[in-house]
């Protein structure tokens, strides 16, 4: 099932949480992992930890909200590696902190979309030429079950009624679907992953799943063989419904 010829994977937001664990597991599998992070000190510390574990890791300065930063990261990967085999768009933020839609300001939505959607789009577009050079490029967009209209129709705690975050993840899923249609006929596969409510800084460590559990579906989608799906939305149990709740 795992592809043997993949060599280089770039993970955004890789200095902590799900991104760091995903990088670690791909590194254990033998990939060179490029740790995209906007904070240099944290990025280098993450690199140091993985290097001590025997993983071929490298910090790459990458702020997904800054086009110049993305361009420099693309140029670095192009110069030093020539192609990219796996792109994992993991960087994300949540600003609600329990606030309901009417309690948000427009700036909250703009800030959320800047990282979760616009940044993800720019990173994907920027690295696409290098992914095309791969023998089988894989893109995994770390979404959320909250990006499913179906899941949002279920009775949930009001703290999960997060307009900015949920909307941004729904937009990510549409990006996944539309890019998959554009990339039909190529060797690239792109999918969205729902890692579940995980114990990370994103939710002030209030989740109930470990980063190891969360990384499972991301790793699976990142290492799909040529018969794997593209344009889908998956969690550890399989397909996540886009909109219709049964």
Residue ranges and their predicted role:
Residues 88, 123-127, 131, 175-176, ...:
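Hydrophobic positions on the long internal alpha-helix
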Residues 170, 185, 192-193, 200, ...:
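C-terminal helical subdomain
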Residues 53-56, 76-89, 95-97, 105:
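A glycine-rich helix->loop->beta "capping" turn
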Residues 93, 97-113, 132-184:
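Catalytic loop of short-chain dehydrogenase/reductase
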Residues 40, 60-73:
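The beta1-alpha1 cofactor-binding region of Rossmann-like NAD(H)/NADP(H)-dependent oxidoreductases
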Residues 2-34:
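Canonical Rossmann dinucleotide-binding motif of NAD(H)/NADP(H)-dependent dehydrogenases/reductases
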Residues 29-45:
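Conserved glycine-rich Rossmann-like NAD(P)H-binding loop of the short-chain dehydrogenase/reductase
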């Amino acid at each position: 099932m795992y592809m043997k010829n993949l060599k280089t994977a770039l993970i955004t937001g890789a200095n902590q949480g799900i991104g760091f664990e995903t990088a670690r597991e791909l590194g254990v599998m033998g990939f060179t992992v490029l740790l995209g992070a906007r904070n240099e000190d944290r990025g280098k510390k993450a690199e140091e930890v993985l290097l001590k574990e025997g993983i071929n890791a490298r910090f790459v300065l990458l702020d997904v909200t800054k086009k110049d930063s993305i361009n420099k990261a693309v140029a670095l990967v192009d110069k030093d590696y020539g192609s990219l085999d796996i792109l994992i768009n993991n960087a994300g933020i949540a600003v609600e902190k329990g606030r309901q839609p009417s309690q948000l300001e427009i700036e909250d939505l703009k800030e959320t979309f800047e990282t979760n959607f616009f940044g993800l789009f720019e990173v994907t577009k920027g690295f696409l030429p290098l992914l095309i050079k791969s023998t089988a490029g894989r893109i995994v967009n770390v979404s959320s079950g909250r990006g499913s209209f179906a899941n949002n129709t279920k009775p949930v705690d009001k703290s999960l009624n997060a307009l900015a975050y949920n909307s941004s993840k729904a937009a990510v899923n549409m990006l996944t679907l539309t890019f998959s249609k554009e990339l039909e006929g190529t060797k690239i596969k792109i999918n969205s992953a729902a890692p579940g409510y995980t114990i990370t800084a994103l939710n002030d460590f209030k989740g109930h799943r470990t980063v190891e559990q969360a990384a499972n579906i991301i790793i699976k989608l990142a290492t799909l063989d040529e018969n794997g799906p593209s344009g889908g939305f998956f969690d550890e149990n399989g397909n996540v419904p886009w909109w219709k709740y049964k």
